[in-house]
């Protein structure tokens, strides 16, 4: 590789000699301007010393460093990149070191432009995890970093995020407390007006000693439903004292579960054929009982032949 680079360097053309320094600029205006400059109040023009200083710097530079922007010379003369002990060959450089612009040396004018371009391009391919420290600092982050970042989510991920947000909102809402039943088993529940009216209309036992239990059974607390087995779904209380009142209510619900429903009496339909067969059967039985003493056992049952 070094031999190939030496051959390439041998075929490079010789650099031309440095150009002569530019002449000092002439002041416009001709002799009129010269006459004005001879006055004592006019300040001296500072442009000729600056031009002569620039010409002196160009003279001091060596002739071989003026045109050193070719690829072999730039890559050979560039110092190696310094890497920390934790960074390997495959890991990218941090964003803070990549965003710092390289300081151009006084003798290398063209190499700074050729080396800084690939470093800035490689900065955009650094993953988001490594650029987090650089963006949080805010010193080297520019306005183009915010526009460069883009987050693409699938529709399933968007639905999951929305569902979790709704669940958090529902959990954050204050819920109304449920009405707790009284812990004292001796206090009866408040009767429902519908069941009270139906009990009075039917003439139910109100003066019986078991009347409070019947009233307590017929009156169910709000939001309580009967289960298929006749048990009543009671709301959970924070401190259940005993299961005795719940047991009484469940047993009485099983006994009086049809109290709220009213049935109409059906009109009886008489089947004349069935009545006629029954009367004939009864007549045969009577005649058989009358002739029991004079005939045999089978002859006394004439109705069996009709079957």
UniProtKB/Swiss-Prot annotation:
InterPro entries: PRR18 (IPR031369). Keywords: Methylation, Phosphoprotein. The modification Asymmetric dimethylarginine is found at residue 186. Residues 13-28 have a biased composition (Pro residues). The keyword Cell membrane does not apply. Residues 1-142 are annotated as: Disordered. Residues 128-138 have a biased composition (Low complexity). The keyword Phosphoprotein applies. The modification Phosphoserine is found at residue 70. The modification Omega-N-methylarginine is found at residues 108, 202. This is Proline-rich protein 18. It comes from Mus musculus (Mouse).
